[in-house]
Curated annotation (Swiss-Prot):
One of its GO terms (cellular component) is signal recognition particle. It comes from Thermococcus kodakarensis (strain ATCC BAA-918 / JCM 12380 / KOD1) (Pyrococcus kodakaraensis (strain KOD1)). Keywords: Cytoplasm, Ribonucleoprotein, RNA-binding, Signal recognition particle. This is Signal recognition particle 19 kDa protein. GO terms for molecular function: 7S RNA binding. The keyword Disulfide bond does not apply. It is found in: Cytoplasm. GO terms for biological process: SRP-dependent cotranslational protein targeting to membrane. Belongs to the SRP19 family. SUPFAM superfamilies: SRP19. InterPro entries: Signal_recog_particle_SRP19 (IPR002778), SRP19-like_sf (IPR036521), SRP19_arc-type (IPR022938).
Length: 108
């Protein structure tokens, strides 16, 4: 299945009115297009198109700080909802690893 993914679809700071598609508990704070791309690729999804500067038209009426740029066209064997949940989970893992690695460096 091919579909478009906007960072706003998994951003916990946004209400569903502005395009969040996953539950707030699953969503992430300020996901970047690069994080989404990396997570999708790790999960075996194919990133067909990547435009980090594109702005979701649904976000034109909200505060600048909440406007997350980026658009990805992804091909996945799973439906969009499941793919987004998987991507959120993977980004959460990657962020935890990054924090852990940062923490280890500081202790030395």
């Amino acid at each position: 299945m091919k579909f478009v993914v906007w960072p706003s679809e998994i951003d916990s700071r946004l209400p569903r009115k502005y395009g969040r598609l996953v539950k707030k508990e699953v969503a992430l704070e300020a996901p970047t297009p690069e994080e989404i791309r990396d997570a999708a690729e790790i999960l075996g999804m194919k990133v067909i198109e990547f435009e980090p500067e594109k702005l979701n038209p649904r976000l034109s009426g909200i505060d600048e700080e909440l406007r997350t740029k980026g658009m990805l066209r992804i091909e996945s064997p799973y439906p969009k909802g499941k793919s987004l949940r998987m991507i959120c989970e993977k980004i959460r893992e990657l962020r935890a690893k990054k924090r852990k690695a940062h923490g280890k460096r500081k202790k030395r």
